[in-house]
Amino acid sequence: GLLLASPANPTGVVMSNADIEHICKWCHANGVRLIMDEIYHGLTFETRPTSAVLHSDSAIVVNSFSKYFCMTGWRLGWMILPDDLLEITERLAQNLYIGPSRPMQEGAMAAFDDYVTLDQNVLRYRENRDVLLRELPPEFFGDMAPADGAFYLYADLTQLSKMPLNATDFVNAMLREAHVACTSGVDFDQEQGHQHLRLSYAGSTDDMKKASCRINSWLPSYLKSLSS
């Protein structure tokens, strides 16, 4: 099978509708089962992406209440399955966790009643992204694909210094000295992640501005300490 995520974590990259349609057709022609992670659907800033289910009768689509609906911790989601997988998936679900409780299901249904508030959150995420892109050193994002969805930026450390930087050391020092938390890229990519870090902008816009100021104030001294 082929597993894809759009919008993606950790990069925030959103696949074009044409690319999703093309991949669906390729998978169908080559007998490959497509598993599409659409957990960050709704959190896009330029266009609303299509769903793989609109282009394929055999694709598996996975979604969640955690991200767009702001229900992280409820551990609720859903799958859209082709007919040939319904029975076996139902058996697995019944044996693994039976199902969510009735109050959880009622709460999830209520989440569909207020898209105005949810879309306001998306506007805030977009503003937060723009703050970080504007305020942080441009070297962070020079070679990265545009982050048009989710609420993450995947920053590149290779252009910040002539000396190679280790992402794990970098994020630990930034947390300890600048009091800004982010995630080392090695959590997502064991081969090249040591040169990248993921920033989340799911918080308040004020927090994004404060974080940018702290990083900009801290970064020169940190880079200087490495060369001394």
Range-by-range predicted roles:
Residues 2, 9, 37, 59, ...:
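Generic structural signal for small/hydrophobic residues in well-ordered secondary structure
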Residues 8-34, 38-71, 84:
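Active-site pre-lysine segment of PLP-dependent enzymes
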Residues 27, 136-137, 174-175:
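A generic structural signal for well-ordered alpha-helical segments
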Residues 57-126, 130-135, 217-220, 224-226:
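Conserved core segment of the aminotransferase class I/II
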Residues 82-83, 113, 156-158, 202-204:
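Residue-level recognition of strand-loop junctions within catalytic nucleotide-signaling folds
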Residues 109, 125-133, 144-158:
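Conserved glycine-rich beta-strand-loop-beta hairpin in the small C-terminal domain of fold type I
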Residues 140-144, 181-187:
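A short linear hydrophobic-aromatic micro-motif
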Residues 163-165, 173-181, 188-228:
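PLP-dependent enzyme catalytic core of the Aspartate aminotransferase-like
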